[in-house]
């Protein structure tokens, strides 16, 4: 029963209850999640209801979600930005990765397929790893060159150093060359990101689909029109 209570699919799974101990969907998805670096608080179903000003943005994000395999297979790039914190950028990015896991689990085996990176934390860990090497971190960093889909959360949170620049550029250059998909979240508009990360990184990050969220901070209890509830996911 423990397996059933902790399964992300318990409310939508069409398999008979009780869960089988050898459920492949559960074990493969759990493996992908455990190797994704997605915070456990983001593993479950988080409903988002857009403010009226974000209706079109949510529709566009829902379209990408519904076609996430095509998005990923074609190596597309998505830049979600807003000058407001807490209005769904990170939640949407993780939703897209989770949907990808949901679509590909049956043909995945026990392999990492997507990774979530909080950019400020990752850059700090890169520097710390020089003096205090961590095999777990090195495996995470190496996976960024290989997995199908990477979320770069909170990119351009601050101006980056030359070391930070070379670290991210080497990974992104490899991913772009291999046609690997990337999702970025930021509080900086595409027009201003160059002043934070430089021209080379800016050209890679902002090249692709850009979606702006304008709504209020959902973490502080911002309300939204119930007429858009059908768009909540």
Regions found by a protein language model. Name each.
Residues 1-67, 209-211, 218-233:
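A short, basic N-terminal segment
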Residues 55-62, 81-87, 100-146:
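Short glycine-rich substrate-engagement loop in P-loop NTPases that contacts/grips substrate
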Residues 71-72, 106-109, 142-145, 173-178, ...:
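Conserved catalytic network of the ASCE P-loop NTPase/AAA+ motor domain
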Residues 72-94:
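Walker A/P-loop nucleotide-binding motif
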Residues 95-99:
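Active-site signature of alpha/beta-hydrolase-fold catalytic machinery across serine-
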Residues 113, 146-149, 178-184:
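Loop/turn-to-beta-strand initiation segments
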């Amino acid at each position: 029963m423990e397996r059933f209570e902790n399964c992300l699919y318990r409310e939508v799974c069409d398999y008979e209850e009780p869960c089988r101990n050898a459920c492949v969907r559960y074990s493969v998805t759990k493996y992908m999640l455990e190797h994704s670096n997605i915070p456990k608080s983001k593993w479950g179903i988080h409903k988002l209801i857009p403010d009226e000003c974000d209706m079109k943005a949510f529709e566009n994000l829902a379209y990408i979600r519904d076609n996430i395999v095509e998005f990923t297979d074609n190596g597309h790039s998505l830049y979600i930005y807003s000058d407001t914190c807490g209005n769904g950028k990170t939640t949407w990015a993780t939703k897209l990765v989770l949907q990808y896991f949901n679509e590909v689990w049956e043909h995945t085996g026990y392999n990492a397929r997507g990774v979530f990176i909080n950019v400020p934390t990752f850059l700090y860990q890169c520097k710390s790893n020089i003096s205090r090497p961590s095999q777990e971190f090195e495996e995470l960093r190496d996976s960024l060159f290989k997995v199908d889909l990477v979320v770069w959360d909170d990119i351009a949170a601050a101006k980056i150093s030359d070391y930070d620049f070379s670290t991210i550029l080497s990974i992104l250059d490899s991913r772009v060359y291999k046609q690997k998909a990337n999702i970025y979240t930021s509080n900086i508009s595409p027009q201003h990101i160059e002043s934070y990360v430089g021209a080379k990184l800016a050209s890679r990050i902002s090249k692709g689909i850009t979606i702006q969220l304008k709504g209020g901070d959902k973490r502080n209890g911002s309300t939204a029109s119930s007429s858009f509830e059908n768009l909540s996911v």
